[in-house]
Amino acid sequence: MTKIKIVVIVGPTAVGKTALGISLAKAFNGEIISGDSQQVYRQLDIGTAKATQEEQEAAVHHLTDIREVTESYSAYDFVQDAQKAISDIVSRGKLPIIVGGTGLYLQSLLEGYHLGGQVDQEAVKAYRNELEQLDDHDLYERLQVNNITIEQVNRRRAIRALELAQFADELENAETAYEPLIIGLNDDRQVIYDRINQRVDRMLENGLLEEAKWLYEHYPTVQASRGIGYKELFPYFVGEMTLAEASDQLKQNTRRFAKRQLTWFRNRMAVSFTAITAPDYPQVVHDRVRDFLGQKEKS
């Protein structure tokens, strides 16, 4: 079976994945697939760091604005949607470029979690429904029985982990349809932290507070509201924090999230990282993609 070549850009939040994705899309006739669990939601643009209108005009983006904030979204959903997007992009002779920071989503796609021929999807759905009926105590016991330890346990993450454990044998035997070039972006910790702090400041200047307040007033308990970028501002709305304190909390949580992202990518994916402050950074990445695609450099 000839595998489909795809480019996957990973790295901590605020490192510049979107900008690189657009640059590669322009250079290699590509289209971008968002691999971010929060960017699927309509009306949540600023806090999710969704590509701006100008950026979306520069390159076609898929899997953004495909769910209402009241809807849930899982790794299983992402894999099904990403499969369809990849097939569509390839059918038009273009290069799929996945840009994302949700490690479980990317791993599920790249390691065969999506293959209906190998994994009984009806069994997956039935098992998920069974888990969703459990209360938190019973769900936690299931994690212990399966020797699963996950950081910051919540129901959504616990169910995902149990699904992967339950169908591990099928997943190990599944053959992915894709040949990925995984490009990792990173830099010194302080460089990343400074970029995060600056981006949070820009988000607040551009209307994040209003976006978060709308979510808090209308849908404070939905899955989308639990994402970093919104829940940190909720205490400000009820007078439990000053805006400065809430902003600092958001920056701190985002920095911690970036650290967890890097840990995930280093431990779970075969990725070589490139420093974004290296003088030859853009050219090095473009050369890697060109070699991957078997193209010659234009004179």
Swiss-Prot record:
Region called Interaction with substrate tRNA, residue ranges: 36-39
Positions with a binding annotation for substrate: 13-18
Keyword annotations from UniProtKB, A to Z: ATP-binding, Magnesium, Nucleotide-binding, Transferase, tRNA processing
Needed co-factor(s): Mg(2+)
Record InterPro entries: Dimethylallyltransferase (IPR039657), IPT (IPR018022), P-loop_NTPase (IPR027417)
EC number(s) on file: 2.5.1.75
BP-aspect Gene Ontology terms: tRNA modification
GO molecular function per UniProt: ATP binding; tRNA dimethylallyltransferase activity
Gene3D superfamilies for this protein: P-loop containing nucleotide triphosphate hydrolases
Binding-site positions, ATP: 11-18
Catalytic activity: adenosine(37) in tRNA + dimethylallyl diphosphate = N(6)-dimethylallyladenosine(37) in tRNA + diphosphate
Residues the record marks as site: Interaction with substrate tRNA: 102, 128
Root EC class: transferase
Family listed: Belongs to the IPP transferase family.
Function: Catalyzes the transfer of a dimethylallyl group onto the adenine at position 37 in tRNAs that read codons beginning with uridine, leading to the formation of N6-(dimethylallyl)adenosine (i(6)A).
Record's subunit section: Monomer.
Descriptive protein name: tRNA dimethylallyltransferase
Organism name: Streptococcus pyogenes serotype M28 (strain MGAS6180)
